[in-house]
């Protein structure tokens, strides 16, 4: 047998004479003749080969291992005690374990040839480049070799020594590998020093893939470093491709890092792209936009224009379901996109999963949009959706409520959720869902009375729903309070106006008042409680203290006032969301005149006189409708 050092000398001499060094494919050493007693060239030469081969063969998979047998692999790996062969054998074994061709514990561990291969690797690791060390460690851990074993610790110690001279991409590879393997003190030390090296060398961040991986590992870095990472993304965004920008946005969405300047930069450069992403990529971008609560109108329009021509080509119902979920959750009202998704669903209604059908109904209701094929679409959907289709009662309630919003609900569907057996199950529902469930039941109950005249089934006992309170956000209250302050110049409280009304129909009304046919304010208390009554009737009080239902005198108008904020409108339009459209329709059916104050018309910074005149004009306008 030729001594190891003589083999090494021979390789070096052949390299000097112009012989081609062994080729490197990914993390696997490919040797033309396993029987040849060859050895690795100098580390510098090998690193160059790694970089060149990675560029030429990026994405190349390992050789097909399906035809290889374990004894053959182990025999080749230990031939001539060549550590090139040993490393190749290690990677091949790792692939075989990953593809479940062999079981490491059962078929490999303890095998004499395997132990011999490990011994060769253990002795040779000190001569390995960072790329080779990292590949060996990844394969060892993938095989299931104990983290406390000598060979694993030898490779990790070699990586620890190489951290300072390692390339930045290799540092990130060490980071991602060790995050998942923190079983020993040495592994923890490698991770700690790797993080310190990355933070110290942050100026070397250049690739979009590197930044994406760093974002996914954000919990391990300081806030200062993450700020620098954000800066690098914004600095390099204009050099990135559309897919790279999309992946970075998705990474931010996954970790829910709402770094607004970064998201804006990514959205800006994505919207400028002339090429198109695939439907799956666009679905991922939509999901990220939804998670980040960043419905940038320009980016959304780009997504819609990219997606609409490709919808018909989608064969994966789950992808369509995911897109529908995002549209509904964002309340994004894009008629073109909703139309093609509705057509896609109609053509496949008999084969679509029930989740897709319910997602479409919920999305259309959320956006307050009626598709042009509604007359043919909804019968196909409702024929497949029934209470037994859902394991959770709340899911069926969502469907019935959505059909109510869309004006497509049937008496049987309403009866199924207003039945005492269904209503009595509300206390069993999760606490955070109860308010929403009760509000939807109130909406449905009101629709049964006011919109569905043929309904004769059970109704809610409103006395059990007196504690249902709708709360507004701080920004919403700010606009509403400003409007009320201006309105008091026309309608002094409490004689002429009720404010902040929690109705019996599950709708919050900012104000209620009464006027004559000319718009002159009348004392609202003279005409009973109106919407203030949880019974929903116009209730007055007798001198004895008992209540009495009062009929509205002729010529008197009851007026309900809504202050609409940004969140009350569907994204991408000045159309109210479905729930608000339903509230408006229910109030109209109750005989109310409606004053609607949208945020984009009302100027909080405007002069008081002008605002009062604006409100007065809106009141008079409502009386002639």
Language model regions located:
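Eukaryotic RNA-binding helical-repeat scaffolds
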Residues: 2-625
